[in-house]
């Protein structure tokens, strides 16, 4: 995983990637939820290397996107982009813009990333996660 340290670097990562999904984890690196999500992402990265690039962004060091993506009251949020387009993911929580909790299961994340890739390649801006019981497991 590559850490992006400026708004410009985040924009360039999203704009320049033509073939893969860009996964951006916004968060506060010292927070326990962020650490859990980073562990899932680092385990998933080798399995996703052919169709996804994973980046991390410190919300406090790079506040440029806090308003745009409504990241004010979250400690971790994961978003997906493809060819400079934000891909929304319906995981059953009502908020399709981002996954705003730490996932515990690497396979769940891999499954979501695969669905995002397949849907984005077909031109879809909103994809439905393979399982929508994430909201139940979250609470």
Predicted regions, residues:
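N-terminal "domain-start" segment that seeds a small globular fold
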Residues: 1-13
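Thiol-based oxidoreductase modules, predominantly thioredoxin-like and allied folds used
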Residues: 3-6, 26-28, 42-66, 73-75
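Conserved beta-strand elements of beta-rich interaction domains across eukaryotes
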Residues: 9, 28-31, 59-62, 83-86, ...
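Acidic, Ser/Thr-rich intrinsically disordered and amphipathic helical segments
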Residues: 9, 36-43, 64, 77, ...
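Short amphipathic alpha-helices and their capping/turn residues within compact interaction modules
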Residues: 9, 15-19, 42, 46-53, ...
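Short active-site neighborhood of thiol/selenol oxidoreductases, capturing the structured segment around
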Residues: 17-29
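Intrinsically disordered, low-complexity regions enriched in proline, serine, glycine
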Residues: 22-25, 34-36, 51-57, 65-68, ...
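Non-catalytic, surface beta->alpha helical segment in thiol-disulfide oxidoreductase systems
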Residues: 73-74, 80-131
């Amino acid at each position: 995983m590559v850490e992006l340290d400026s708004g410009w670097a985040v924009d360039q990562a999203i704009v320049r990637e033509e073939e893969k999904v860009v996964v951006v984890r916004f968060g506060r690196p010292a927070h326990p939820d962020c650490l859990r999500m980073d562990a899932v992402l680092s385990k998933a990265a080798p399995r996703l290397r052919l169709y996804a690039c994973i980046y991390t962004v410190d919300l406090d060091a790079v506040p440029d996107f806090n308003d745009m993506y409504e990241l004010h009251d979250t400690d971790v949020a994961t978003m997906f982009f493809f060819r400079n387009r934000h891909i929304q993911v319906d995981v059953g929580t009502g908020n399709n813009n981002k996954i705003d909790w730490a996932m515990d299961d690497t396979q769940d994340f891999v499954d979501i990333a695969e669905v995002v890739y397949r849907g984005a390649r077909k031109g879809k801006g909103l994809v439905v996660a393979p399982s929508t019981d994430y909201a139940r497991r979250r609470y």
